[in-house]
Design a protein with these regions (language model features):
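Hinge/beta->alpha junction and helix N-cap segments in small-molecule ligand-binding domains
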Residues: 2-51, 66-73, 95-97, 112-121, ...
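Flexible loop/turn connectors
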Residues: 54-154
Length: 154
């Protein structure tokens, strides 16, 4: 299951989702995309979305979850509530890789974004804009890393 942001708006985050889907397809992995609502980031909404997904897929037709940190953790919680095991029955991988993926049990495998570097680049670009520099379709790409947790390995 691939939790993705809303396609109702144009956003650079679509690139990571399209690339994820392409690579999974290339590897012969079938994905079910669950599209999250635009601009909804609260835990209650994530709980609703995860429950909605699990209710729709009442048969265990999936063995993995890929979503933001909070979505992946809520999926892990729902798997456990339904008396299944992580990672034996369902593996969970988060993207963002904030500290919360390390303080839950089991710790969540995460694609870690370089938050400090993202903040520095954002501040640099804002300062340059304030000082009169103009950009057209400026794109900054920073590398990510994988931090292995216990949600993908037994």
């Amino acid at each position: 299951v691939h939790f993705r942001g809303s396609t109702a708006v144009e956003s650079p985050y679509h690139e990571r989702h399209f690339e994820f889907a392409r690579i999974m397809k290339e590897q012969g992995v079938e994905c079910f995309d669950y599209e999250l609502a635009w601009n909804k980031f609260d835990l209650e909404y994530y709980k609703y979305a995860v429950k909605d997904l699990f209710d729709r897929l009442d048969e265990w037709e999936f063995d993995g979850i890929f979503g933001t940190d909070l979505v992946a953790i809520e999926c892990m919680n729902e798997v456990i509530r339904r008396h299944k095991k992580v990672p034996k029955d369902v593996k969970c991988v988060a993207y963002d890789g904030t500290y919360i993926t390390q303080i839950v049990e089991p710790s969540v495998t995460a694609i870690v974004q370089p938050i400090k570097e993202l903040a520095k680049e954002a501040a640099r670009l804002i300062c340059e804009l304030v000082n009169g520099k103009t950009y057209k379709n400026e794109k900054v790409t920073l590398g990510v890393s994988v931090r292995k947790g216990r949600t993908t390995m037994e």
